[in-house]
Structure formats: structure tokens, C-alpha cells
Amino acid sequence: MHLSHFLADNGFKITFVNTEENHERIVSAGAHGDRFRMISIPGGIGPEEGNRMIDAIEYDMPSQLENLIWKINGEDMDKITFLIADFLMGWAVEVAERLGLRSVAFSAFSATSLATYLSIAKLKETGVIDENGSPKTKEKFKLAPTATSIDETYFGWYFLKDIEKRQRMFRYFENNEQSVSKARFIVCNSFQDFELPIFTNFPNIIPIGPLPLGKTSNPAGHLWSDDTTSIDWLDQQPVNSVVYLAFGSIATLDQNQLEEFAFALDSSKMRFLWVIRSDETMGEHHDFLKQLQDSINRRGKGKIVNWCNQEKVLAHPSIACFISHCGWNSTLDGVKNGSLERKSDQN
């Protein structure tokens, strides 16, 4: 979304195609401007459906996207002439090829993770993984001579415990490697100095990060609406006095973990801003979190919000410490704003 807004601010008209599952939440989370056209197509199925979800992505969505582009280009003055595909949706590159459109792929991953997905055939050939994507050795390996050594934790399919689902996911990544290779190049949310060995040895990966690029006229869409009171609260705090805690858009904490963080924050006597998403406050956690928030509000040393503009928060002079799950986007946000990761938080 950051890349789309940057392109729109530089004169391009954007048609942003999303799944129905995410569409309404992104549209309602923020404005996108008159150069944006937000469209959804059926995602096919929910994430709990496992292999069927992968089948829907691989076999159902390509025809839906192709039909959508045919319809727009047949009826609309603003025809689609260029396609930017999510790297993990390599089939969209093949759709563009069939329709005679130029295309590139975009990856929100680190260049190292991206290079791993582009090296599946080579990793099989060199004996690092077997035909089903399982590591054949516990030894670490390198994707380039001077790159950091990595292990199987970089394999996006290997975290699945169900063997059938893991193998199905691996087949998808195998097919995706072949499809996405047809893109002219792959743009990546990283920068040259951060992962130089990868960019040197994978010339088709082009760094364009860290995103966002410059100032955009509209906020990038998220799945949650920003709580703007977080900045108002930070404005009232002394310089370098606040601990900021946020664990991304997917990671969840159980009640024991929430209690441990709450106890640590209380013991530290530090001011803090803590992001706890609404989907973490349902069910068994709801009463506990309500009590926690009431207690924090009474003491006046902290604030809990559902979501906030992380870049604005990290750029605020009151922030002294950033505690995160060390996802790639959060890592880059921290680096941009002088909050460097410790040791091996991201390899």
C-alpha cells in the first residue's frame, strides 16, 4: 500500500485489487485519494481451510483477476497497462503475460527471505533440501558467498507441523518460483547497505526501501484504524521517557504473556504506549484486558491502543525504547527512526 500511494502521488492511477476478506477493512481504515480505485475479488476460502485455501489461490484467483482486467480494459477509459504483483502471487505475473501487460513483482520480505524463495530449485540441486522441502542436513547454508548463514527457519513452509499441509505449501512455493521468474524484476522493501551480498548476487532483486518513499498525501491502508490519541498522549510526555510495545498485525500473546508484560512495565516505572489489537481482546482475554486497561488509566503512566501509526510514534521525541516482535516492517521502521535492533533479532 505504501508503494501504491507513492506511485499515486507521482501521477499514476492505481487499481488496487484485494481479496473480499480484507477489502472492507482496508477501505474503512483510511482514505486513499481520487487516483485510487479499490476493487476486491473473492479470496475463495478462509485461512482455516488449509490446503483448500492454497488451491483457491492457485487455481481460482488467476481467472478472477484475468476477467477483471479484461472487463476494466473493455469498459473503462483508465485502462490497466502495468501490473505489480505480490511476490507470493506469481500466477498474477503469468496473467499479465497472457494479457500483454508489463509486470514486476513486489516483496515486503527482507531480500534474504526473498532470495530463499527464489532458490528452491538450487537448494534441491545442491542437497540442502529434499524433494518435499525438508532439510537434508542441520548445517547452515549461504545463499551467496558473503551472505549471512541461514537455516531451515527461513523456509516459509517448514513451520507447518502437518506434513500434508507442509508439502502442499512447498509445492505452491515451487510453482511460484517458476511463475514469478517471468517478471522483469522484483522490487523489495529493503536497501542496498542492509543486505548488499544478496543484491550483488541476485541482480533481479531491486531494493526500493525502506518504505514509505517520501511523504504521501494519504495514509497507507491497514486492517485497523489508527487511534490518533496516541500522538496526543505522547505530546504530553517528556523526551526519551516512553517504552513503545507493538507486536505486528498477526502475532498474538496469550494471557500469561500479557500478564508478564504488564508486570514488567509496572515494575519498570516507565511510561509506556502499548498496542493490543482488537482481535487479541476477544474471548477469554476480554475481561483481563479491560481490567488491565482500567488499572493503567488510573495510574496515568501508560496508554493502551488498538492500533496506531507506528512511523509517527517511532519518530516522536518521547520514545525511548521499542519492544517488537521483530517482523521485517517493524525492523525497518525502527532503523529509519534510530531504534536499532539488538544482536540477532533479524538475520
Language-model features and meaning:
Residues 1-347:
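Glycosyltransferase specificity loop/lid
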